[in-house]
Amino acid sequence: MMSPSQASLLFLNVCIFICGEAVQGNCVHHSTDSSVVNIVEDGSNAKDESKSNDTVCKEDCEESCDVKTKITREEKHFMCRNLQNSIVSYTRSTKKLLRNMMDEQQASLDYLSNQVNELMNRVLLLTTEVFRKQLDPFPHRPVQSHGLDCTDIKDTIGSVTKTPSGLYIIHPEGSSYPFEVMCDMDYRGGGRTVIQKRIDGIIDFQRLWCDYLDGFGDLLGEFWLGLKKIFYIVNQKNTSFMLYVALESEDDTLAYASYDNFWLEDETRFFKMHLGRYSGNAGDAFRGLKKEDNQNAMPFSTSDVDNDGCRPACLVNGQSVKSCSHLHNKTGWWFNECGLANLNGIHHFSGKLLATGIQWGTWTKNNSPVKIKSVSMKIRRMYNPYFK
């Protein structure tokens, strides 16, 4: 059996022979010997030429393969770089998108959580109110014992038996009619007539002059007794009254402010308030820290009856204010260029403290106003021969 190289050589010789025959046919003037010699020489040359061509082809192939390999390698590197950049860019955009989605979801959850908490607080307050109204314990029943005020009732009935706190009917001097009041008969000897109380925010204190004049709310819960009724109580003859402001913070801290010689001028003077000496641990917010804060000797103001001293406007925390009542969400108070006190402000829940909230600006903690949860204003008779 022939080897591949031998077969190739035989095939090459056959080709050379055929070519030689063709040349011999065209060139008849050459001799046979010359033809044979030429054929042999041509065969030898063809063989050398074939080898040379094979070498050149091999070199061209190797060079082409190297170029192709180099191009393929560069293309792979280029594609890898592009793919890597695309993955990094996609990862970053995906992270940013997910972060934004998570922030939006968290904000929505926080909002819904606050809404649920506020609704739960409202439901709890309403449930408590309904339950309280269903109960009718003896101390809350009006006692048909007409006295001038709660101090008078305490001094009269208390000499015979223990006087419970609750609803009583009083008929102060100067009043043409009797009316019902809540009497605190327990705190520091009792005999205190409650003229205002804030505990849960159920009663709306955003009222006009007529409501603050006659009073509103529930004497067993939140209420404002009324300017006319307060006037009749504190302007009786030969006596004076002490005003006691009881404050409770959201963390259940208690504080108070007390003023002797508390009285009001009549309706023609818009129930201008007068205060005596201060004592307590909550600070004197009625008089404030500056002259323009002083609410003593100021008339009462509401959103429709403006007596707050802002003529035509006053500056409050850098803000131009034309009406303190409007600034405080249309609540009524003895404003003086607004001032530091407003116990009739809007009752806020869950730690909120706004400019319209219940305010006693001199009661502070860590140099910040204390957030007030509940407050009551009580008056007690003081016998004072110098009172006019």
From Swiss-Prot:
Q: Which Gene3D superfamilies match?
A: Gamma Fibrinogen, chain A, domain 1 (3.90.215.10)
Paired cysteines (S-S): C310-C314, C324-C338
Tissues expressing the protein: Mainly expressed in adult heart.
Alphabetically sorted, this entry's keywords are: Coiled coil, Disulfide bond, Glycoprotein, Secreted, Signal
Q: What is its main location?
A: secreted
Q: Name one Pfam family in it.
A: Fibrinogen_C
InterPro entries given for it?
Fibrinogen-like_C (IPR036056), Fibrinogen_a/b/g_C_1 (IPR014716), Fibrinogen_a/b/g_C_dom (IPR002181), Fibrinogen_C-term_domain (IPR050373), Fibrinogen_CS (IPR020837)
Q: Which residues are glycosylated?
A: N53, N238, N329
Q: Where is the Fibrinogen C-terminal domain?
A: 141-383
Signal peptide coordinates: 1-25
Please give the coiled-coil regions recorded for this protein: 98-123
Q: What is this protein called?
A: Angiopoietin-related protein 5
Source organism per UniProt: Homo sapiens (Human)
